[in-house]
C-alpha cells in the first residue's frame, strides 16, 4: 500500500538459538545478534553482527523452542534458569517448561477434558478403544498435529497403530475420545498471565482431515470467545499464573480442553492482524 520498509518495521530485538548458549565461570552467556522484524512476506527479517553478553543483562528472554522435549531442550531450560536466578524474566518459567507436558498438563483439569487415557499398556488402551469406539491416539511429545491417528470401531489397523505409537509398549501415549465437533474446527485461546485474550482463532480442518492445526493445512477464522471458552480459561488461568506460564495457548474442541501449549504457542499474529 505504498508503505515504506521503515514504516513496516515491527520490532528490533536480540536473537539467539540454543547453540548460542554457553556457561562461563558459572554464568550463562550467549552469542547474540540484533534481529529486526518487518511485516513483509518476502523479506521479513534482518540480522545484525554478533556480540557476546551475559543473559542476565537482558530484561526478558522469550523461549520459543518447538517440541519435541528432548535432552537438548532440557539442558537449554537449565542454562536459562541461571539467568532467571539473576533476575531475567524467562517466558515461560524454566521449571514449568520442564514440568508441564502439553498433553499431560491438560489432564490436571479433568472437569475441562473429554474422556481420555494416558498409558503405554496395549491392553488398557484397547479396552479404552472398545469402550468409546471412536478414538484419537497421539504421542505426548508431538506438535502441529503430527502422528495423530483416528481409529474407529473395528478398525483393522488398531494393533499396528498402537505398536508404532507405543514402540511395542515402551512409550506412553494418549488416547482421547473422538470429538465430532472437530468438523467445525478447534479453537486456539491465547492466555497472557492467566487471562484469556478476548478473541480466539478457530482452526478449520481441510476436507477429509481430523486435524485443525495450521501446520496440518487448516485455515483460521478469528472470533470472540464463547462462554465455554471463557469458563475453561478461568479454570486454567490461576494455575498458569502460579507456575509462571505467562504466554500459553489453549486448544479447545467443542466444549473440551485438549492441550495446553506452553513451549511455542502460535496464532497470536493471526488474531492481532484481524483485531488490531
Enumerate the predicted regions with their spans.
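Conserved N-proximal alpha/beta basic substrate-recognition cap immediately N-terminal to
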Residues: 16-118
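Phosphate-binding site of ATP-dependent enzymes
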Residues: 122-123, 130-134, 141-230
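Short glycine-rich anion-binding loops that position phosphate/pyrophosphate groups of nucleotides
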Residues: 65-68, 140-142, 265
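Structural detector of well-ordered beta-strand residues that form the stable sheet scaffold
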Residues: 14, 90-91, 136, 174-176
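Short glycine-enriched loops at secondary-structure junctions
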Residues: 94-97, 203-205, 253-256
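Single conserved hydrophobic/aromatic residue that forms the stacking wall/gate
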Residues: 1-12
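ATP-dependent carboxylate activation and anion-phosphoryl transfer catalytic cores
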Residues: 207-208, 224-276
Amino acid at each position: 500500500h505504498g508503505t515504506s520498509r521503515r514504516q513496516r518495521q515491527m520490532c528490533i530485538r536480540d536473537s539467539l538459538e540454543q547453540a548460542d548458549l554457553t556457561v562461563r565461570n558459572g554464568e550463562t552467556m550467549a552469542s547474540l545478534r540484533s534481529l529486526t522484524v518487518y511485516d513483509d512476506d518476502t523479506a521479513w527479517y534482518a540480522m545484525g553482527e554478533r556480540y557476546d553478553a551475559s543473559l542476565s543483562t537482558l530484561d526478558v528472554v522469550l523461549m520459543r523452542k518447538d517440541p519435541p522435549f528432548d535432552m537438548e531442550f532440557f539442558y537449554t531450560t537449565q542454562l536459562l534458569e541461571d539467568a532467571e536466578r539473576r533476575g531475567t524474566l524467562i517466558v515461560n518459567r524454566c521449571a514449568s517448561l520442564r514440568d508441564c507436558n502439553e498433553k499431560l498438563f491438560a489432564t490436571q483439569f479433568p472437569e475441562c477434558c473429554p474422556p481420555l487415557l494416558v498409558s503405554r499398556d496395549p491392553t488398557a488402551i484397547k479396552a479404552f478403544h472398545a469402550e468409546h469406539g471412536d478414538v484419537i491416539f497421539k504421542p505426548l511429545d508431538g506438535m502441529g498435529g503430527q502422528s495423530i491417528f483416528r481409529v474407529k470401531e473395528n478398525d483393522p489397523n488398531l494393533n499396528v497403530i498402537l505398536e508404532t505409537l507405543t514402540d511395542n509398549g515402551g512409550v506412553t501415549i494418549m488416547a482421547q475420545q473422538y470429538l465430532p465437533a472437530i468438523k467445525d474446527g478447534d479453537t486456539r485461546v491465547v492466555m497472557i498471565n492467566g487471562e484469556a485474550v478476548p478473541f480466539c482463532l478457530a482452526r478449520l480442518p481441510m476436507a477429509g482431515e481430523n486435524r485443525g492445526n495450521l501446520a496440518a493445512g487448516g485455515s483460521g477464522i478469528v472470533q470472540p470467545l464463547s462462554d465455554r471458552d471463557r469458563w475453561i480459561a478461568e479454570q486454567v488461568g490461576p494455575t498458569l499464573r502460579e507456575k509462571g506460564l505467562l504466554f500459553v495457548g489453549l486448544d479447545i474442541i467443542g466444549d473440551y480442553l485438549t492441550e495446553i501449549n506452553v513451549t511455542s504457542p502460535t496464532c497470536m499474529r493471526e488474531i492481532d492482524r484481524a483485531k488490531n
